[in-house]
Amino acid sequence: MINYIFSKSNILINYVGFTVVWFSCVYSGAQGNPIIAIVPTFIFLLLHFSIVTDHLKQEIQLIIISIILGLVVDSSFSLLGFVKYNGTLDFAPNLAPLWIICMWAGFTAQINHVMKFLIGKYLLICFYGLLAPLAYIAGEGIGAAIVKDTYLSYGFISICLLYTSPSPR
């Protein structure tokens, strides 16, 4: 019973933690202040790592791989002209900004926890991947990014994120 309660509360902590990270990252992009994204992400990851002590090494590896993959994918979106992110570095305007990298780290921390119910549910995984453009629409609405050539961009973003997102173990 105690293990059940802890497992459910850990999922809730993980979900709420990522929600805070997501909003702080998008707000960080809108404000052009990376600290707004870094601090909540760091706190969330510390809390997350304290929960996943039984497979900490694998979780850290997954997050690092996801950060690298996210950097490549979102930088490609910018380089191809699909998305213009706010908060980029002056000397590397097509490099995905820090707030996007923080978002990838936070998102990946959910994969083996909040999204664990997706294991083996391939249609649901595809549907979840197709919802990714909604995050870009919300980010655009808040002022963190501008999506250009809307239909083509959102289609491309959906396909890329569907194929690049790690799946639950």
Language model region names:
Residues 50-61, 116-120:
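Membrane-interface helix-boundary motifs at transmembrane edges
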Residues 12, 16-24, 60-76, 80, ...:
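Hydrophobic, lipid-facing residues on alpha-helical transmembrane segments of integral membrane proteins
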Residues 163-169:
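Conserved small/polar residues in nucleotide/adenosyl-binding loops
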Residues 24-33, 50-53:
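Short, hydrophobic transmembrane alpha-helix segments
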Residues 31-40, 58-59:
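Short, aromatic-rich membrane-interface segments at the entry and exit
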Residues 149-162:
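Membrane-interface transmembrane-helix boundary segments in multi-pass integral membrane proteins
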Residues 75-93:
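Membrane-helix boundary elements
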Residues 1-15:
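N-terminal membrane topogenic signal
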